[in-house]
Amino acid sequence: YLTLMGMLRGENEYTYPPYNAKQATELITCLREMAPYVIIDCGSYIANDILSAIALMESDAVLRLVNCDLKSISYLSSQLPLLRDNKWDADKQYKIASNIKPNEASEHVEQVLGSVTFKLPYSAELAAQSLAGDLLADLSLRESRGFRKAIEAISREVFGC
């Protein structure tokens, strides 16, 4: 089974009252009791996002995805001093060069991150599904094979399946 939780169309971070670290911790604890695996898509601005900060601290594993474009690499460079703090436990972080397009060099990400654990290639099929709001559809095109294989490798490493 797959359960998704998120905001409805038209909602944003100001739709609901603010919450604190204790409430974020309680939410994650409750989710862990309900499901064997909990995946939280954290925001990139963790200094002001309590849920993302708590999720990063409480997690068993962190997948840190970074696109190979200049904007993503520059932003990550500015956040690395914060992410290297001991409270974020760098040993449980998997570094992933993500959405690698043929004309982009993942080596630039590796210069900033150090070695990456996985590389996720760009998939036009996935991009089309994202635009259509159909992210749960199968990726069936041949050009998506590299993406599927990378996701399988990540699943084996992180979830043991």
Model-derived regions: residue spans:
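Beta-strand-loop-alpha "switch" segments that mediate conformational coupling across diverse proteins
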Residues: 99-140
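Hydrophobic "anchor" residues on beta-strands that sit immediately upstream
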Residues: 37, 56, 94
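A short acidic, amphipathic alpha-helical/loop segment
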Residues: 50-55, 73, 78-79, 106-109
